[in-house]
Regions:
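Conserved pre-ATP/AMP-binding loop-to-beta segment of ANL
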Residues: 124-146, 153, 176-183
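AMP-dependent adenylate-forming
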Residues: 6-28, 453-455
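Conserved AMP-binding/adenylation subdomain of ANL enzymes
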Residues: 165-182, 189-241, 246-250, 254-257
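AMP-binding/adenylate-forming catalytic core of the ANL superfamily
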Residues: 80, 331, 336-337, 359-444, ...
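Gly/Ser/Thr-rich phosphate-binding loop
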Residues: 205-207, 239-243, 253-311
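Conserved ATP/PPi-binding loop(s) of AMP-dependent carboxylate-activating enzymes
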Residues: 315-319, 328-354, 367, 382-386
C-alpha cells in the first residue's frame, strides 16, 4: 500500500488543511491524518491484527498504520456471531485485537488483560494474544478479509497490498474522483468494498471521506435500516458519492416517494452486493438519484466492473482497466489479472483465472450483465432453466415485499417464501404476484407462496453478514411448508 501512503503524504503537503476524514465527532485534515498515522503506527505491534470496531476515523487510521507497518490487517465484522468471531480469531491466528467492544472479546478470550490505545481522540482496548500459528501467510499479505459465505464457517481471503491498490487506482480513474468529492460510507468498514470505496479511493484521490458510526446513520446490525436517520445523514453530509446495497436504495426510494427530501449533491451512487431490480433502479433515477450498478468479489480484491454515466443502465458496467473478464462455455463469469493469493489455511490459488460462480454475458459494447448464480439456477420439470434472482429482485422491488426466495428445481411450477414489509402488507402480496406474473414467461411465474415466519437475517442463520440469503438454510427451515405447497396443502395459490 506504498502508493496510497505516498498519496496521503503528498496531499498533506499540497492541501494540508483539506478535510481527509470525518466521523460524528472527529475531523482530520490531510496534515492531521499524516501526523496521526506517524504517531500511532509505532504504538501498534503484532503481525496479524484484528479490528473489531464501529465505523469512524480511528478505524481508517489504524488500518493505514497497519499498512505502513507491513502488518496484516484483519477486519472483524461486528455483525458476526460470537461463534464466528471465535473461528476468525483462531483461524487467522490473531496476535492483537483492537476494539471498542471489549466485553465481547473478554467473553471470547476469557481474559480482561488489555492495554489502552488512543486514536483520533478515542480510546480503544488492545488485547495481546499468544496464538499457535496454524497457517503461514502468503507472501506480501496486507489484508485478510473474511467472507461470511452462505454455508460453513467464514473463509479468510488473503490479499496483497498491490492487488488492493490496483482496484483503488482503477476505481478512482473510472469515476473521475477529485479533491472536491465528499464520499459517505454507509457500509460496515469490516467489508472490503467499504475499505476500498470508502477509505482508500477517496484518500488516493485527495477527496474527503465521511465515516459516521453505523447507528448514527441508521444502520442496525447487517440488515436493519432506519430511513429517517439514513436520510438525515445524507442531508447533513451532502455527499457527492456513496455506495449502497439494494435494500438501502429501496428504503431511500420509498422514503423519497413519500416526500422525503434527498440531497442534490450526489453525482454518483454505486449499488452492489446483490441483484438489483431494474424497476427499483428506474424508480431511483426518476427521483433524480444517479445510481449505477457495480459487480465484484473478495477473491478479485472487490470491484470488478462499474456502471458509469452515459453508459447502459441495465448492466453492471465494463470491467475496470486492471482486470479481465471472460465468459465460459456454460455462461460462468471468469476473472483474471488481479486475484487473491489464497484462502487462509488452504493451498495457494493456482491458474490465472478464477471462476466467480456467477452466470452472465458480455454484450457487444463490452458491458457485463449478471443473470444469476451458477449454483442457484435451476431447471423446472419442463426443462426450462431459471435464475431465481431475476424473479426475486422483481418481487422485492415492490414496497410490500422485503425479501423473497423462489423454488422450483425439477418441479411442475414455482413456489416462493415471502417476507412482507409489515403485517398489514401481507394481503397485498397476492396482487403484487398477480401483476408480476402477467409480465413473466409461463415457466417463470409463481404459482404458490407462503408468508415467512420472520425476516431472513444473519442472526437466525437465514442470511449471511452481507445480507445475501442462504437458500439452503431457508429451504431446510421451510421444507415441510414448501412440500405441502407442491402437494396441494394450505397456501396462497394462482393454480
Amino acid at each position: 500500500m506504498e502508493r496510497l501512503l505516498e498519496s496521503i503524504a503528498s496531499f498533506a503537503a499540497q492541501q494540508p488543511q483539506h478535510l481527509a476524514l470525518a466521523d460524528n465527532a472527529v475531523i482530520l485534515s490531510y496534515c492531521e491524518l499524516l501526523q496521526e498515522i506517524e504517531r500511532v503506527a509505532p504504538a501498534i505491534g503484532g503481525r496479524r491484527v484484528g479490528l473489531l470496531m464501529d465505523n469512524g476515523c480511528a478505524w481508517a487510521v489504524i488500518d493505514l498504520c497497519l499498512q505502513k507497518n507491513g502488518v496484516a490487517s484483519v477486519p472483524m465484522p461486528t455483525f458476526f456471531s460470537d461463534c464466528q468471531l471465535q473461528h476468525l480469531i483462531d483461524d487467522a491466528s490473531l496476535d492483537t485485537i483492537i476494539t471498542d467492544q471489549p466485553l465481547r472479546i473478554i467473553k471470547l478470550l476469557q481474559t480482561s488483560l488489555s492495554t489502552e490505545l488512543t486514536v483520533a481522540e478515542q480510546k480503544f482496548d488492545c488485547f495481546h494474544l499468544n496464538p499457535v500459528e496454524k497457517s503461514p501467510l502468503p507472501a506480501r499479505t496486507a489484508k485478510i478479509t473474511y467472507t461470511s459465505g452462505t454455508t460453513g464457517q467464514p473463509k479468510g481471503v488473503c490479499l496483497t497490498g498491490e492487488s488492493i491498490e490496483r482496484v483503488t487506482e482503477s476505481l478512482s480513474e473510472v469515476v473521475a474522483a477529485m479533491a472536491q468529492d465528499r464520499v459517505l460510507t454507509l457500509l460496515p468498514l469490516s467489508t472490503l468494498l467499504a475499505n476500498i470505496g470508502g477509505i482508500y479511493a477517496p484518500l488516493y484521490s485527495g477527496s474527503s471521506a465521511f465515516l459516521p458510526d453505523m447507528a448514527e446513520c441508521g444502520m442496525a446490525g447487517s440488515t436493519g435500516v432506519n430511513a429517517e436517520l439514513l436520510i438525515s445523514t445524507l442531508n447533513h453530509v451532502q455527499p457527492t458519492a456513496t455506495i449502497l446495497v439494494p435494500y438501502q436504495l429501496k428504503i431511500l426510494v420509498e422514503a423519497a416517494s413519500r416526500g422525503a427530501t434527498l440531497p442534490n449533491s450526489l453525482r454518483y451512487v454505486a449499488v452492489g452486493g446483490a441483484p438489483t431490480s431494474p424497476v427499483l433502479l428506474d424508480q431511483a433515477r426518476e427521483l433524480g438519484l444517479p445510481v449505477y450498478q457495480g459487480y465484484g468479489l473478495s477473491e478479485a480484491a472487490s470491484v470488478v466492473s462499474m456502471g458509469l454515466p452515459g453508459r447502459k443502465h441495465n448492466s453492471v458496467g465494463r470491467p475496470l482497466p486492471h482486470i479481465k473478464v471472460r465468459i465460459a462455455d456454460d455462461g460462468e463469469i471468469m476473472v483474471s489479472g488481479n486475484l487473491f493469493s489464497a484462502y487462509l489455511g488452504q493451498s495457494p490459488r493456482t491458474g490465472d483465472e478464477w471462476p466467480t460462480g456467477d452466470i452472465g454475458h458480455l454484450d457487444s459494447d463490452g458491458e457485463l450483465h449478471i443473470t444469476g448464480r451458477k449454483k442457484t439456477s435451476f431447471a423446472t420439470a419442463h426443462g426450462r432453466k431459471l435464475a431465481p434472482e431475476w424473479i426475486e429482485s422483481e418481487l422485492t422491488s415492490h414496497p410490500a415485499i422485503v425479501q423473497a426466495v423462489l423454488f422450483g428445481e425439477g418441479r411442475d411450477f414455482n413456489t416462493a417464501v415471502v417476507v412482507p414489509n409489515c403485517a398489514s402488507a401481507a394481503p397485498k402480496i397476492a396482487d403484487v404476484i398477480s401483476v408480476l406474473n402477467h409480465t413473466l414467461p409461463d415457466y417463470a411465474r409463481i404459482s404458490r407462496w407462503i408468508i415467512a415466519e420472520e425476516p431472513f437475517s444473519f442472526r437466525n442463520g437465514l442470511a449471511n453478514g452481507a445480507g445475501t440469503l442462504d437458500r439452503s438454510a431457508i429451504e431446510t427451515r421451510y421444507a415441510s411448508q414448501i412440500e405441502r405447497m407442491y402437494q396441494g396443502g394450505e397456501c396462497n395459490a394462482f393454480l
